[in-house]
A protein has these predicted regions:
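Membrane-interface "cap" regions at the ends of multi-pass membrane proteins
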Residues: 1-28, 57-62, 66-91, 246-250, ...
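Inter-helical loop and helix-membrane interface segments of multi-pass membrane transporters/permeases
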Residues: 2-5, 33-37, 67-92, 105-165, ...
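Membrane-embedded translocation segments of transport machinery
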Residues: 2-3, 7, 169, 173-321, ...
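Helix-loop-helix connectors at the membrane interface of multi-pass transporters/channels
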Residues: 4, 108-140, 244-248, 253, ...
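Loop-to-transmembrane helix boundary motifs in multi-pass membrane proteins
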Residues: 6, 12-14, 20, 142, ...
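Select transmembrane alpha-helical segments in multipass membrane proteins
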Residues: 6-17, 42-45, 84-98, 146-152, ...
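Transmembrane helix-boundary motif of multi-pass solute transporters/channels
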Residues: 11-49, 198, 236-242, 253-256, ...
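C-terminal membrane-solvent junction of multi-pass transporters and transport-like membrane proteins
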Residues: 89, 94, 339-353, 385-443
Length: 456
């Protein structure tokens, strides 16, 4: 692409990259493990690992994207030394993006469906068992879930079809702005509930008893894993946005801004969840159960709960949708970079492909529920998530690390020159030994421990 599309503003790049990083884990995992492992004490350890783990790898993804001016499908071809095979990572990146969307679009559909369910008062008068029954009924209906999944896919690809600036950038900027506004409204409501102070104390005051009672090693690994996985690094989802920006600012400074926004969303989500749960005497829990059962049950009991419930699911939909739009943009760019197709044609082909590829995840909860690939009670979604989260993300991050530091790859000097071009925070040159030798070992440790915890 000689006439590479560009973001119209620096803010657009930062918000869209943050939108890609901000996902459902910020809401249904971060607050839970923060409470479990010691509140503010855990957050401090998490932030340290975010700087040590997530930030360097994200800078490398952005650097590869900006230097090559290509998506992950072609970026390694452009930068690798002649005769090497680094470009094989491009195929792994493509597989990772498609696999991620094969289950993420279904969950995005759940969020959109719950806006409608909450708005129409479907939860009114139900007890906790009734609220759980609504969720289980949705999972049992393949046609209903397919409708919402297709709606999410069509809306996202339509936005991408409008172009980078007029579609992706404009809509995502508006979406992220609304997301933060809704977050603030929900936080204010949550912390002013009677009894919310106990939840705030649990969440914000460092508790080194909880920090140590789970085992210091387990606590550190939990912080390490959250810091690594929150940014979805290793499959080129960030690299594409590096290819859409100029060289006015250093990439380390931009990455710091994105990490701060991602952390802010996760932190504010905790300010919604813990005060609310403590105010109503409910165990927060984690995962889909928190979002689709626990919180609707709380909104049921809250004055003005329907309004705040709708706002919450709009926020969750925006969090999911911002990631989906960002990854769809990456998928579209694969077709454009590899085959020279037009944006409209790439949208049409990939839109149909994603809908078809997302159906196994939908069916895995109902008509194909007998297929339990990860053991009793597991679903196709669990398998897809395992392939992406436990394999492609850590191994892909390892490739980016080695590619940017090894003389057999793009090399340290080329990486550092690209990362430091522009004004702003420079990547620390003294960290070469750390990112070349120590950080790959940490990522390898995360990869091995992921398997151990999954199959122990």
């Amino acid at each position: 692409m000689n006439n590479r599309e560009r973001f119209s503003s620096r803010l657009g790049f930062i918000l869209i990259s943050a939108g890609c990083a901000v996902g459902l884990g910020n809401v249904w995992r971060f607050p839970y493990i923060t409470g479990q492992y010691g509140g503010a004490a855990f957050v401090l350890v998490y932030l340290i690992f975010l700087v040590l783990l997530g930030l360097p790898i994200m800078v490398m993804e952005f650097s590869v994207g900006r230097a090559s001016q290509k998506s992950a499908a072609r970026s390694f071809h452009v930068l690798e030394p002649a005769g090497t095979k680094w470009h094989l990572q491009g195929y792994a990146c493509m597989a990772g993006n498609y696999l991620l969307m094969m289950f993420y679009t279904t969950v995005g559909g759940w969020m959109a469906a719950y806006i409608f369910k909450t708005l129409t008062g479907e939860f009114k008068g139900l007890d906790s068992d009734g609220v759980a029954a609504v969720f289980n009924d949705m999972l049992a209906r393949p046609g209903y879930m397919t409708f919402w999944m297709v709606l999410v896919v069509l809306l996202s690809f339509f936005i991408c079809s409008l172009g980078l600036q007029k579609g992706v950038e404009r809509i995502t900027k508006a979406m992220m702005s609304c997301l933060f506004l809704i977050l603030l409204i929900l936080c204010i409501r949550s912390v002013t509930l009677p009894g919310a102070s106990e939840g705030l104390r649990f969440y914000l005051i460092p508790d080194f008893t909880r920090f140590t009672e789970n085992g210091v090693g387990n606590t550190i690994f939990a912080a390490m894993g959250q810091a690594f996985f929150t940014l979805s690094l290793g499959i080129g989802a960030m690299a594409i946005f590096g290819s859409y920006i100029g060289k006015d600012h250093t990439l380390t400074g931009e990455t710091i801004n994105i990490c701060l926004l991602d952390t802010l969303v996760a932190f504010l989500a905790g300010l919604i969840i813990f005060p609310s749960c403590f105010a109503f005497g409910v165990d927060p829990g984690q995962g889909p159960g928190l979002v689709f059962i626990t919180l609707p049950n709380i909104f049921n009991q809250m004055v003005g709960g329907r309004i705040f419930g709708v706002l919450f699911f709009v926020f969750m939909t925006f969090a999911a949708q911002s990631t989906i739009i960002a990854v769809f943009e990456n998928i579209i760019s694969f077709s454009i970079d590899l085959f020279g197709t037009s944006r409209k044609k790439a949208v049409l082909i990939n839109g149909i492909a994603i809908i078809l590829l997302s159906l196994p995840c939908v069916f895995g909860f109902n008509i194909w529920s007998g297929f339990q690939p990860m053991g009793a009670g597991s679903t196709i979604q669990d398998l897809e998530d395992f392939i992406v989260s436990n394999n492609l993300l850590p191994l892909g991050s390892m490739v980016y690390l080695l590619f940017c530091t090894s003389r057999y790859g793009w090399g340290w000097k080329n990486f550092l020159a690209e990362a430091d071009t522009g004004k702003g925070v420079k990547f620390p040159a003294w960290a070469r030994v750390y990112v070349s030798y120590i950080l790959p070992l940490i990522v390898l440790f995360i990869f091995i421990m992921g398997y151990y915890q999954k199959f122990k």
